[in-house]
Regions:
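N-terminal glycine-/serine-/threonine-rich phosphate-binding loop
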Residues: 1-40
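Beta-strand-turn-beta hairpins that frame and shape the catalytic cleft
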Residues: 1-7, 151-160, 182-183
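Short beta-strand segments at enzyme active-site cores
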Residues: 39-45, 96-100, 240-242
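Metal-dependent catalytic neighborhoods of phosphoester/phosphodiester hydrolases
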Residues: 47-64, 70, 107-108
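CN hydrolase (nitrilase-like) catalytic-core segments centered on the catalytic cysteine
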Residues: 76-97, 167-309
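Generic short beta-strand
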Residues: 115-116, 122, 272, 276
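A short, polar/charged loop-to-alpha-helix boundary motif
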Residues: 130-144, 295-322
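A conserved C-terminal secondary-structure "cap"
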Residues: 312-352
């Protein structure tokens, strides 16, 4: 196993709802990261080819055409687009973790929020489907299964991934920790609105004025860092938090046809942006950098600019903390707790 792992986290926007162009961009980023000696290249949640932000900002009855386009621009796990990404991993000699909106072979409208970890020979090491789409995501994606709750054993270490809100699921995280995970990838969208900035008029029934802005909107930066750091501390592993970037083409697609375009635009502009960053096995920030004019430049995180963030990880640093809290070893009571995980792939029908 290599003593030092260099990870490249792509804080990048897709060509929104364009699978072919997004795939081409992903391949270019893989090659760029490989040229900077990365061993593992990571992409955000459903990088190919969009995250359905519109479902949080517009009523479902306004979004039929967007769902149709999302289906058209989603890809098969064994389709041409993912095959091209696999070839880029093979030709560049790197591992790739990439999120994508996955088409189902069983239905012409069923989608999954999925992620592949691809090996240096272009082989698929892990194919994970998000267990439960979160909140408004249920309008786009179907629930996955436990098949992808696996840690990839590679020449660069033991690497696992969970998608967005799955990093809130203690049992899913424990399942990864129990496979001796050394590097945990968490992937996130650029924004995740839980309310618009529009106020709701007084109720006709009780006369109480309620505002949808009451309480804080969802803060991707704080919420993601909290969950990612907690996992690193509990697992004594390194963390890669890779978030999407919202391009202008996404703004145009989300606002187009909205019944309240001003509200949608204002909310999109005001929402906190997610960040891409690295964590060490204590949950603390890990020093990271970008390349500017072929020179390293220290950078704690990426949030407001597209780029590739790099960090070097000494995987032996995962060992010391296990003396204190090995929650799948000496700090666990296996005589009390018993967790079983079904990792079978679930199909809608079995033909005999």
């Amino acid at each position: 196993m290599a003593s030092i792992l260099r990870v490249a986290a792509c804080h990048a926007s897709p060509a929104f709802l364009n699978a072919r162009r997004t795939t081409d961009k992903a391949i270019a980023l893989v090659k760029q990261a490989a040229s900077n000696k990365a061993n593992l290249v990571v992409f955000p949640e459903t990088y190919i080819s969009a995250f359905p932000i519109w479902s949080s900002l517009r009523p479902p009855t306004d979004n039929h055409w967007l769902f149709q386009r999302m289906v058209q621009e989603s890809v098969y796990a064994d389709g041409d687009e993912m095959e091209a990404v696999r070839e880029a991993a093979r030709s560049s000699g790197v591992l790739v973790s990439i999120g994508f909106s996955e088409k189902s072979r069983h239905s012409n409208g069923c989608l999954y929020n999925s992620n592949l970890i691809i090996g240096t020979e272009g082989e698929v090491l892990v194919h994970h489907r998000k267990l439960v789409p979160t909140f408004f995501e249920k309008l786009t994606w179907s629930p996955g299964d436990g098949h992808g709750l696996r840690v990839a054993s590679t020449q660069f270490g033991r690497i696992g991934t969970l998608i967005c809100g799955e990093n809130t699921n203690a049992l899913a995280r424990y399942s990864m920790i129990a496979q001796a995970e050394q590097v945990h990838i968490s992937t996130w969208p650029a924004i995740w609105p839980t309310r618009t900035l529009q106020k709701i008029p007084p109720s006709a029934e009780n006369g109480v004025h309620q505002a949808s802005t009451r309480g804080a909107n969802y803060d991707n930066l704080a919420a993601n860092r909290t969950r990612a750091a907690a996992h690193c501390f509990e697992a004594k592993c390194f963390g890669v938090a890779c978030s999407g970037y919202l391009g202008e083409d996404a703004f145009e697609a989300i606002v187009d046809g909205a019944s309240q375009p001003d509200v949608v635009t204002e909310t999109l502009r005001a929402m906190p942006r997610a960040a891409t960053f690295f964590l060490d096995p204590t949950g603390a920030p890990l020093p990271s950098f970008i390349y500017k004019d072929s020179q390293k430049q220290d950078m704690d995180a990426l949030q407001s600019d597209e780029d590739i963030l790099y960090a070097d990880m000494q995987l032996e640093d995962c060992i010391e903390g296990k003396q204190y809290h090995d929650v799948v070893g000496g700090y666990q009571r296996l005589d009390i707790f018993d967790l079983k995980v079904d990792r079978s792939r679930k199909d809608p029908v079995k033909f005999l």
